[in-house]
Amino acid sequence: MTNEKIEKVHRFLEEHGISHKTHYHPPLPTIELALEYWKEIDSTHCKNLFFPNHKGNRHYLVVFECHKELSIHTLEKSLKQGKLSFASPERMERCLGLLPGSVSPFGLINDMNLVAEDGTPNEGVAAKELFENGHRVKLFLDKDLQEAELVSFHPCDNTASTVISNADLMKFLGLWGGEYEWIEIE
């Protein structure tokens, strides 16, 4: 049985010349469970959190090294984006095509091509949710990840972890075309 979400990620990466290696494992919805399976995977493993702002019209994906702790209050201050809360499963599905426990930058392939050539939002896309660049999501990455040679994320499903080089992550983000920013996460 094939997993459509994982296959979609693999297809996108391969179509764009992004090298990757995927490791399959039981569902790992939390970092605590994942650490046991990640021991044999040579990469920097990441934690990925998805937040809407207090109005629900802006969405932020925050990616950082999995051993770090994140204070939402500190994040709110540093991002200057207002009050943040964890996204509901419905919002995750709508914006990233993901379910809780599977949040990943690879979900950004579902944050592409949201507007028509004339700039109007495609069907099912609310204009109020779009940033000026035509994407629903702004990405914040931990500055320390710039030093990682390899990084790993769930390929839109928590039954696998996909490893790519940092250079290929940057290529992926360029293909996505949305806004991202490097931030300090203690």
Segments predicted by a language model, with ranges:
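Extended, low-hydrophobicity, polar/charged segments
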Residues: M1-E186
